C-alpha cells in the first residue's frame, strides 16, 4: 500500500498522526511500514514525475470537452440533465481566463454536491448555468509541486484488502480533524493520498518510490507488479498501461479501484 503526503501538508505533525494510527493495536500487527522517504521537489521536478503522474488529468484540464469519450459524454448528460453538445465544457486552464481567477480561487469555488461529478477520474464542476469546468483542481495542484516542495512517500506491507484498509484511513482522517490538520467537511485526500487499487498502487509506486540509486523501484519488487509479471506480462506492457490508462476507452485506474489482483488483471486483459 502506497501513501504519500501532499506538499502543502507534508510535515512532522501529519506524519505523526499516521504513525500513531498504525501503532494502534488494531493495525499494529496487520500493517508494516517498509519504506519511508522525503522525496525532494527538485528531484521530482527535474524528472517530470508529477506531470507524468497526473498526465491523464492534465490532458482533460487542457482539452476540456474534446477529451471526453462517448461514454463519458453520456454520463455527463445523465447526471447534469444537459445534452453534452449543448453544454459549455472547458478545461481548467481555459476556465482561469474565462473567469478571471487564479489557480487557488478556481479550486476553491464551492458548489453543491449535485453540481459536481467524478467521471472516470475526471472532476467536472458546474460553476454557472451552462459552464462546466473539468479538473478545476489541477492548476492549483500543479503550482504546489515545485522545486522547494517535498513529498513524503511511504509503503506499507499488509495482507489487508483495499476495503479492509479503508477503516485505517477513516481513523487517520478522524485524527487529522481532531488535531486541526483537516477541516471536518473536507476529504482526507486534501492531506494525503493512498493507493485504492492495484493499478493505482503501481502508478503511485512508480512515481514516488525510489531505490538507493534514485531509480524507480522495480516492478518485480511490487506485489501487483510481480503478480503481472508472473502472469506473463512484460515491463513494457505494464508501463504502457500506466502511461495510457484510457487505451480501452475507460480509465484503468478508476475501473479497478478496490479490486483484487485477479479482478484488476481480468479488467486489463478484457480490453
Language model region names:
Residues 1-271:
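Non-catalytic terminal and connector segments of soluble metabolic enzymes
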Amino acid at each position: 500500500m502506497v501513501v504519500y503526503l501532499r506538499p502543502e501538508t507534508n510535515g512532522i505533525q501529519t506524519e505523526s498522526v499516521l504513525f500513531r494510527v498504525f501503532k494502534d493495536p488494531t493495525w499494529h500487527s496487520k500493517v508494516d511500514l517498509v519504506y519511508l522517504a522525503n522525496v525532494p521537489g527538485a528531484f521530482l521536478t527535474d524528472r517530470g514525475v508529477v506531470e507524468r503522474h497526473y498526465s491523464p488529468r492534465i490532458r482533460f484540464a487542457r482539452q476540456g470537452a474534446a477529451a471526453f469519450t462517448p461514454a463519458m459524454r453520456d454520463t455527463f448528460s445523465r447526471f447534469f440533465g444537459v445534452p453534452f453538445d449543448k453544454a459549455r465544457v472547458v478545461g481548467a486552464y481555459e476556465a482561469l481566463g474565462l473567469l478571471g481567477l487564479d489557480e487557488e480561487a478556481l479550486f476553491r469555488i464551492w458548489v453543491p454536491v449535485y453540481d459536481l461529478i467524478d467521471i472516470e477520474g475526471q472532476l467536472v464542476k458546474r460553476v454557472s448555468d451552462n459552464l462546466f469546468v473539468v479538473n478545476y483542481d489541477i492548476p492549483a495542484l500543479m503550482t504546489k509541486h515545485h522545486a522547494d516542495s517535498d513529498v513524503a512517500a511511504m509503503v506499507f506491507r499488509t495482507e489487508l484488502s483495499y476495503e479492509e484498509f479503508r477503516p485505517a484511513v477513516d481513523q487517520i482522517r478522524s485524527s487529522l480533524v481532531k488535531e486541526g490538520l483537516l477541516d471536518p467537511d473536507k476529504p482526507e485526500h486534501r492531506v494525503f493520498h493512498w493507493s485504492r487499487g492495484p493499478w493505482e498502487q503501481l502508478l503511485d509506486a512508480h512515481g514516488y518510490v525510489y531505490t538507493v540509486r534514485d531509480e524507480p523501484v522495480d516492478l518485480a519488487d511490487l506485489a501487483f507488479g510481480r503478480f503481472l509479471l508472473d502472469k506473463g506480462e512484460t515491463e513494457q506492457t505494464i508501463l504502457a498501461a500506466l502511461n495510457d490508462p484510457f487505451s480501452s476507452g475507460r480509465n484503468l485506474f478508476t475501473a479497478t479501484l478496490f479490486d483484487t489482483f485477479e479482478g484488476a488483471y481480468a479488467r486489463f486483459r478484457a480490453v
